[in-house]
Amino acid sequence: MLPRLFLLVLLGFSSAALLRGAAPLTSPKQHFGFAIGDDYQLATYTQTEAYFKKLAAESDRARLVDIGRTEEGRTQWMMIFSAPENLAKLDRYREIARRLARAEDLTDDQARALAAEGKAVVWIDGGLHASETVGTHQLIETVWQLASASDPEMLRILRDTIVLCVHANPDGQELVSNWYMREPEPTKRVLTTTPRLYQKYIGHDNNRDFYMSAMKETTNLNRQLYLEWFPQVVYNHHQSGPAGTVMFVPPFRDPFNHVYDPLVIVGVETFGNAIQSRFLREGKPGATSRSGANYSTWWNGGLRTTTYFHNMIGLLTEVIGNPTPMRIPFIARRQLPANDLTSPVPPQEWRFRQSIDYSLAANRAVLDQASRYREVLLYNIYLMGRNSIRRGSDDHWTTRPARLDQISRLAAADRTGSENNEDSPEPGEGPPSGGARLPQKYWDLLRQPDWRDPRGYIIPADQPDFPTAVKFINTLVKTGVAIHRATADFSVGAKRYPAGSYVVKTAQAFRPHVLDQFEPQDHPNDFRYEGGPPNRPYDVAGWTLAFQMGIAFDRVLAAFEGPFERLPYGQLQTPPPGRLPNARAPVAGFLLSPRANDSFILVNRLLKQGAEVFRVTTPLPAAPAFGPGAIYVPDRGQARDLVRTSARQLGLDVVTVPAAPAVENLLRLAPTRIALWDRFGGSMPSGWTRWLLEQFEFPFEVVYPARIDAGKLRDRFDAIILVGGALSAPGVRPPPTPRPRNLPPEFEGWVGRLTPEHSVPALREFLHAGGTVVTIGSSTGLASHLGLPLQSALTERNAEGRLRTLPDDKFYIPGSILSVRVDPTQPVAWGLPERLDVYFDRSAVFARPSNLPGFQPIAWFETETPLRSGWAWGQKHLKNGISLASIPVGAGRLHLFGSEVAFRGQTHGTFKLLFNSLQLATAKPAAAR
């Protein structure tokens, strides 16, 4: 009795401490002038930032942490909430979370002791997709609740957990809220398309950047997730819920990825069930899961999904809601209770505050679950990390669909003509399920040595584009992966590697993420029913980053050691300084490799300075490995200093030559006047391309449809880039053109779209006048608009003999990586290898024309099995199809890049296609001067 009484007294003192505040707390209504969730009201980031600062100053439960700058220069904030006594030991609890997540040098007993001492760390974010306004505003209300609520449940949550409340997109909130609130009459306010993307470059794709970490905001968030705090639970708020429901809640539909720990999926289901259970207790109907939407746990790259590959429980909800009142529609199939929709919601008018309340209830459910199972969460993240380390330290096999299919086909072939029925059940067993029953020998085949998971990967320092390999290493560094670097030359097996090579071992906690970035994804064949249409993957099916970036690496299947130094976690790498010989003999000029992407940065700097720069059309004896297209810079004036300083900075090795190459083999470069298409509301492919051009220091101008339609483009531009979505193919209905009411005058010139009637004649005129047009993805349809006799390779004749596009049940390749054969003698392909990985997302593929003079195939599908990573149903239809091509049109040139050569800033392996096409747009034979 006495110990229990003593405990109650202690709890009472603790609760009293939580109830005390240093000063009265400012409510959202007092600060913003309206309650969060009021109709027709949105808060700006400027107001939200001020509120965070005010609340942090007033509450002893809160800390405010600056986590970095956004792309537009704003401060990105994270608020940390816990009991005051926990905040006093915040560094200790963060250290416990870090040690358990990395699972290094810990015994199980030590991990249990740390789990008993630690606090569950829960991440709740808001605002990543700024037009999804519930997310930002539930975050504001959540920080208020965490700072002010004094009910027993909240006090327990604060004692047991550390809550990270993270603003995911400050720039977007400022843009969207100001755009909505610009209408002075509240009842006329409507959430419409903003003039530009709600993240400076990539808009909605800010949730597609989390393994690449290209954007500043992504890097800020990843640092907190994988280098600082290691939360066991990450809750990512989104909109909008499926029509006829209120909210999509975990668990998710299949497939889930084969490389991560099953405890991840069990944890996701546990928390999803906790949310749904709370909704039912509180009388909140309308939550759906699994088949209620197409969200899955297959893909890496989103804020929520990348956590799975780091042994964290990633939660996503998608809720309806709008500051302008809306209505839940009547959808008959959403009114019948089912496993994935246990409590349908009636059609009704719906208010913003109702969505806020659902989000708050979901947050409470997650925090309550984390509080109740604090030790389990902490120990489980250790257990998953320990499992990863053990799997990477021993022989381990990941079961993949393609291997199972291969074994099944082998077994079927073995059974042909055999009277032995392997499928007959044993006595006492039911009928076979899940496929044929196979003998043990086929299981043993699945464990053949060559199918083992790698123990590690070696990225050689002597590969043609090592600076890009370093960029790849930095994507791993930013996501918390342990990296080693060789301090001396070493050998593994029969191969020799130079000092400076990087080594990534799989015996580490984040092994799933390591495997995912090096190994091909093997997406299962996923159809609604046998012979039916495919189930579209959530986002993409294959993305192996090492393939996309064109990195040379070796898989090592057995244990290996060497002179390796382990780099500090989070330490970004730079390439070794480029080498430039100190030639004693006279030097005529310098050669740069066309195989290194960063050579284009140096070329752009030289052109900006007015230096002479040439491309060499044939291989040179001084640098035979460069192949055709080497960059030649005469040793003159300031060019010498710029080559020396930039080459060292960029890690570019320079070759000196005593004599200039023959003038007939030189193309003189000049600055290219580049136009990049965009539209009102912003195009994500255009935004990514804008970011890419800035990174590689290309000068360019963004142009809108009205400027293209105005014609006389050759007077101002040398090259025009039309990314995917700029121009619809003939016969394809274009998307509607947004035109908000009360459009400010400065945006009038942004409205409109490219059309066959007005835009194509202007582009034809530009081409005939000597301009270059680079088309990517769907915009390659310009060739048909121009009347060029090009046909798709992905067609068949129907019963009536008419040509039609192959249906999805015969050919379907969502986002995946395919291999093509390249002709590196083509100028646009200079610097590329003969085999290239390209990103393919239902992309254009051309049949070889028989009557198109000057048509130049650049890359084509050479085999019936080009799949490298992802899902390719009916890939045999690609054989001999052309992926990349170039055509002369008048005095100009049209480049057709059916595959996505600049996809999301990730496809470094194909950037040269874009860069060459731009720099060569103004190239002239040097002899013609």
Label every model-predicted segment.
Residues M1-L2:
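N-terminal secretory signal peptides that target proteins for export/translocation
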Residues L5-A17:
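Bacterial N-terminal signal peptides
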Residues A22-T161, I202-G203, R208-D209, A214-K216, ...:
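Intrinsic-disorder/low-complexity accessory segments
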Residues E153, T161-V166, P170-R208:
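Divalent-metal coordination cores built from histidine and acidic residues
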Residues C165-P170, Y180, N236-G244, S779:
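Short, solvent-exposed turn/loop segments enriched in Gly/Ser/Thr/Pro and often Arg
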Residues D171-G172, G241-A243, P323, S728:
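Feature marks short, surface-exposed loop/turn motifs that line or immediately flank catalytic pockets
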